[in-house]
């Protein structure tokens, strides 16, 4: 399954401690493409593991994680405006 993950962590005192942990978890499973955005092909068991790890740190009242998924990345159109990073320019 192809996944795009986007997170938003409030950067209060606790958030500053959570942010690097969330980043590290996401990077373990997906490719970092822009600030708090990750993408990649991942199996369902790994998606479950990713979500379970993130739930340990995400504060439901202030932080958020959004997962967009598709069976295959070729069903998505990716269009760039501005700087194109090599990590995310593999396809359009």
Describe the residue ranges of each PLM region.
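Short, intrinsically disordered low-complexity segments
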Residues: 34-64, 69-70
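Intrinsically disordered, low-complexity boundary segments flanking structured domains
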Residues: 24-25, 51-56, 77-79
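C-terminal structural segments of small proteins and small subunits
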Residues: 57-92
